[in-house]
UniProtKB/Swiss-Prot annotation:
Keywords: Lipid biosynthesis, Lipid metabolism, Membrane, Nucleotidyltransferase, Phospholipid biosynthesis, Phospholipid metabolism, Phosphoprotein, Transferase
Pathway membership, UniProt: Phospholipid metabolism; phosphatidylcholine biosynthesis; phosphatidylcholine from phosphocholine: step 1/2
Protein name per its UniProtKB record: Choline-phosphate cytidylyltransferase
Protein's organism: Saccharomyces cerevisiae (strain ATCC 204508 / S288c)
Catalytic activity, reaction form: phosphocholine + CTP + H(+) = CDP-choline + diphosphate
Record-linked Pfam families: CTP_transf_like (PF01467)
Family statement: Belongs to the cytidylyltransferase family.
Enzyme class: transferase
Locations listed in the record: Membrane
InterPro entries for the chain: CCT, Cyt_trans-like, Pcy1-like, Rossmann-like_a/b/a_fold
Gene: PCT1
Chain intervals with Basic and acidic residues compositional bias: 45-55
Miscellaneous: Present with 3050 molecules/cell in log phase SD medium.
Region (Disordered): 1-70, 348-424
Coiled coil: none
Amino acid sequence: MANPTTGKSSIRAKLSNSSLSNLFKKNKNKRQREETEEQDNEDKDESKNQDENKDTQLTPRKRRRLTKEFEEKEARYTNELPKELRKYRPKGFRFNLPPTDRPIRIYADGVFDLFHLGHMKQLEQCKKAFPNVTLIVGVPSDKITHKLKGLTVLTDKQRCETLTHCRWVDEVVPNAPWCVTPEFLLEHKIDYVAHDDIPYVSADSDDIYKPIKEMGKFLTTQRTNGVSTSDIITKIIRDYDKYLMRNFARGATRQELNVSWLKKNELEFKKHINEFRSYFKKNQTNLNNASRDLYFEVREILLKKTLGKKLYSKLIGNELKKQNQRQRKQNFLDDPFTRKLIREASPATEFANEFTGENSTAKSPDDNGNLFSQEDDEDTNSNNTNTNSDSDSNTNSTPPSEDDDDNDRLTLENLTQKKKQSAN
């Protein structure tokens, strides 16, 4: 049990005038400290702003000076090399001349996951950079690659084995370091490290190949645009459903593909819809023809019922005759032999027609084709005339008139005169 007298004394001490004054003094000290800190921060900010303003005022001059120095340095570095080696020099750095008394050892490192055309072209450039090259390829382990770059499709052993089957590769170094060090170069007697000139950024540095470039042992290769492992993976992810259906069709199970039961049924439903669409598109013409035939059959049945058999037979007969006329005319015009028989206007035919008395106008193919329509009209009219031939012959038969005899005499006289003129 606590003594009540001691508790009261402590409370009195806290509430005494001296303690209250001390509390106010503490608050004053805090305020003074905060004010001084704010002033110091403002002074620092002003000084920084002044320095930045000075820098911004000097940047155009600095830029001109730096660009001029950089251009002079680039010109000096390029003039040190022969023309055939200038393309291998990295921008802003020197390039060492290759040794002549031994094979040149070039090192190219990379993940080489899903070995593709871009990898092959880069290794080919390394191998063909000099006449006598030994190409060494380094492959980092799965542990380092997954930590620094991300998950891979193939394991490090599979990637190393893939590179051994490439014709340009002479040696494969497994468990290669992520950043090449001078000790690693000495260990494997490497003359050049090959990669494209784009800075390769990591967590520690802006360019992991910068120390190698400063040593003059960096060989620049050209990157193949549009081809990379990331591009291949993005294509697969973009068409994920299509590749799933492809693997299901080849016998893969949903457990192997890590697909849920709902996703599999969804894909099968989409597959059936696509199959129905393709079937409908293929058979659309057949369906149209069948519907057209059905329409004509129904139409004929309705015409028979409404018109009767006699009118329907007459209607069908006229339509068939018209179709036959068109077909015969087309066959006549398409036949080359009959087209040769058509007489066309010429001076010889006109001269002969003057003595024969025939019509001098030439017959066109359409005129000859119209003969079929005339013949068909005669056939149609023959049936009607035959029925009334007996009665019409008795009533309409009249002897030839005198005008007809006069016309015949004139034509004979004209012919005899023309023959005499031709003989003279």
